[in-house]
Curated annotation (Swiss-Prot):
Gene, per the UniProt record: rpmI
Similarity comment: Belongs to the bacterial ribosomal protein bL35 family.
Pfam families, sorted: Ribosomal_L35p
Domain of life according to the entry: Bacteria
Keywords: Ribonucleoprotein, Ribosomal protein
GO biological process: translation
Protein name, UniProt field: Large ribosomal subunit protein bL35
UniProt source species: Stutzerimonas stutzeri (strain A1501) (Pseudomonas stutzeri)
Annotated Gene Ontology cellular component terms: cytosolic large ribosomal subunit
Disordered: annotated span: 1-23
Gene Ontology MF terms: structural constituent of ribosome
Amino acid sequence: MPKMKTKSGAAKRFKKTANGFKHKHAFKSHILTKMTTKRKRQLRGCSQVHPSDVAKVERMLRVR
């Protein structure tokens, strides 16, 4: 039986770390003039995938 393919969209969005998976925040690509500076600052950087979603991400990336 052939190997299962990873979901390429998920592979672009999530990275495996020692503590789980990291991802970038949404709503930070365009039409940012309406958004306050505070909101844009809060959306900077990466965050961890919520523990309830880790199993889904692992299944999409074929981790385990």
